[in-house]
Amino acid sequence: MKKLLNTLYAMSEDIYLSLDGENVVANRDKQELARYPLHTLQSIISFSYAGLSPALMGECANRGIGVALCSPRGRFLARVCGEINGNVLLRREQYRTADDEAGSCRIARCMIFGKLYNSRWSIERTKRDHGMRVDGEALSNASVQIKELLPKVLDETSLDGLRGLEGNGANAYFGVLDQLILNDKGTFSFNGRSRRPPLDPVNAMLSFAYSILAHDCASALEAAGLDPYVGFLHRDRPGRTSLALDLMEELRPCMADRFVLTLINNRVMDEKDFIRQESGAVLLNDDGRRKFFKYWQDKKREGLTHPYLGEKLQWGMVPYIQAQLLARYLRGDLDDYPPFLWK
C-alpha cells in the first residue's frame, strides 16, 4: 500500500480494500493491514486481483473519489466514477491544451527536457562507474552536446523546434550508446537505431521495451483520467496513443534503455533469445520474450526515491505518478508539469 498525491495505490495482487465507516481498510487474508480516511483521498488505483468491495466503490462514486482497476502487471481494466464527477472537465482541459500550440509546447518542453536530462545522466553514470572500460572522450563530448541543448529546450516556443532539439539530443545519445554496452560485443553491438524492423538484437530489445513502456504509460494515463490518444508533442493519428508516447519520452533513457543495457551487461540475454529473419529483421523469440517480461516485472518492483516527491516507491509506479502530476498540472494545481529527472 502507498499513498501519494492523495492517491491510494494498492500494489499487491492479494490486497482487498473495503469500507468501514469513514475509512478505507486494506486487508490481506482477512487480516487488517492499514486504514486511510476517505476524506483525505482523491483517487484509488488498485493493481490487485481481489479489488474493492461494492460498498467502497459505491461510496467513492458518491464522494467523487475516482477508482481505477488495473491488473497486477499494470494493464488498465476499468474505472469507477460518480454521476457528476467523472473526468470530463480534466479531458476538456486536455483537449483545449492540445489544440493550443503554446499550451502544448509548455508541457512538451518539460517532457523533452526530462528526456535529454536523463539521457545525459545515463552517459555520466557509465563514465563514473566504468571509466576504464569506455571511451571517456566520446562520452564526454556527447554529454556536453546534450547539456548545451537543455537551456535551448527551455527557451523554445514551437513544437517543431522542440522536435528538432530532441532529434539532435537523440543523435548525440545514440551515437555513443554502443559505449554503454560492456559485454558480448559480438552479439550486442549497436550502430544506430533501426525500427520496423529492428536489424540487430539491441534494437530488437529497445523496440520491445518501448512498446511495453508505451503500454504502461497508456494504462497510467487512463487511470489518471486522461485520454492517452490526444498528445501535446505527438499529434493525433488514428490508433496511436499519442499522449502515452509523450509521457514515455522522459522515461525512455532511465526505464527502457538502462533496462536493456542491464540485461546485456549482466549477460541475461544471448544470441539464442533472438530470431534472425531472411528479410534482415531481428526479433525476440518466445523464450526471449518470456525472459524479457520476467526481468521487466522484476525491474518494476525495484525501489527508488521519486526526485520530485521525495517519496520511496517502485519503478513500476513512476508512469502512474507522472500521469497524476500531469493531470494535476492540467487541473491548475501545479504551475508546470514536473518531469521525472533521474538522479
PLM regions and their residue ranges:
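Active-site helix-to-loop segments that bind/position phosphate- or nucleotide-bearing substrates
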Residues: 1-20, 29, 35, 87-343
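Terminal-proximal segments
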Residues: 1-72, 82
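A surface-exposed, charged beta-strand/loop segment in the N-terminal or early-internal portion
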Residues: 40, 48-121
